[in-house]
Amino acid sequence: MRVLNNVTEAIGNTHMLHLSKIADEFGVQGNIYAKMEYLNPGFSKKDRVALQMITEAENAGLLVPGQAVVELTSGNTGTGLAIACACKGYKFIVCMSKGNSMERARMMKALGAEVVLVDQMPNSVHGQVSGEDLALVEIEAQKIAKERNAFRADQFNLEACNHAHEKYTAEEMWEQLDGNIDVFVDFLGSGSTFAGCSKTLKKHNSSIKCYVVEPETAAIYSGKEITDQGHKIQGGGYSMDLPLVDKKLIDGYIQVTDEEATDVARKLAKLEGVFAGFSSGANVCAAIKLLKSSEKGKNIVLTLNDSGLKYLSTDLYEEL
């Protein structure tokens, strides 16, 4: 293994894990293959999009030495940007809802970021960030970007985010599994993982089915009634339109409850030694549901999005 010049060179090329014990536990026929994105330097898949946004902005002359970078985050993209900015010498200001777990804010501050915490809506529940909460963070990010003439690393709109998964994550999946992929599932956050991976996987094999995963109470893409935006699956399910997602790539929809995502995340830890977050549990839960129904016997690939270390202040894992 070569010596790295800086930690951004460690982003990507994550391992692929066959979740055989989980499949046995739930009695399903087929294979669940999980890309271990929580092993990136910032402990999430968002390191990829963070680096890609900075790199493409530099190449386009949109980000120059001495300029600051600003973005909103649930914690993961912000951590990735904090790492990239630390390595490249940019000032980074991050805006985050107070509803997200504070481990993330502390980590970003440790990495040199200026952290701006934004109040939730009056009717919101701590630990359950809604689209309305995120809109408040967006307002603050826009304000700071204007005041400081900062580059806005806009994870919900910049095509660079799709490119990170289109050019790298999906190609790694294809190579690691020798093309033996039938299904891809993804819990929608900003939508870039779904959009980028689906586009590339379908280019390799148009018969690969790509499913959107959403919270059961906030399944806007499947067209279901929104009954509660305040779900526990942090990092996504915001009940909002996602410009990066090409709906023509969607082959189906799966809904997951808070309890299901939590249960599967805990089982991942105890059975597979995988310490991951809520959305990873949601992805694996969706795969299990498909293997029990329409995709029985198939090979399903997904990402394990982030580390369980980011959720120690939540009820995802039991207290001592």
Language-model segments: what does each one mean?
Residues 1-320:
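PLP-dependent amino-acid enzyme catalytic core
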